[in-house]
Amino acid sequence: MKYLAAYLLLVQGGNTSPSASDITALLESVGVEAEESRLQALLKDLEGKDLQELIAEGNTKLASVPSGGAAAGGASASTGAAAGGAAEAEEEKEEEAKEESDDDMGFGLFD
């Protein structure tokens, strides 16, 4: 992902056909080592392709991926014991607390 981001950054900066050395120089300028094999694989995959078409294709693929969770309406719709509903609410609060504690999900900009 970092190689693709560097490639796109160079293209946006005016370099219409970034080379492996261009991408390596950009990554090293921010302290990231470039793996030559991955970089060559990316350049081979992008060779002869229009970036705008690739971005449009990626957007359609991302749109088809489910990204939201199901609504938690089971506890409010049930007519069971109050203790059962309280236990479910407690579990939801614990899940929310876990989600909030991992905001960056362990990813950096160029990791």
Swiss-Prot record:
A UniProt-annotated Pfam family: Ribosomal_60s
Biased composition (Acidic residues): 88-105
GO biological process, one term: protein homooligomerization
Phosphoprotein among keywords: yes
Keywords per UniProt: Phosphoprotein, Ribonucleoprotein, Ribosomal protein
Biased composition range(s): Low complexity: 67-87
InterPro entries: P1/P2_N_sf, Ribosomal_P1/P2, Ribosomal_P1/P2_euk, Ribosomal_P2
Superkingdom, taxonomy of origin: Eukaryota
Keyword check for Ribonucleoprotein: yes
GO cellular component: cytosolic large ribosomal subunit
Residues with PTM Phosphoserine: 101
Span list, region Disordered: 62-111
Molecular function in Gene Ontology: identical protein binding; protein kinase activator activity; structural constituent of ribosome
Known function: Plays an important role in the elongation step of protein synthesis.
Family: Belongs to the eukaryotic ribosomal protein P1/P2 family.
Name the UniProt record assigns to this protein: Large ribosomal subunit protein P2B
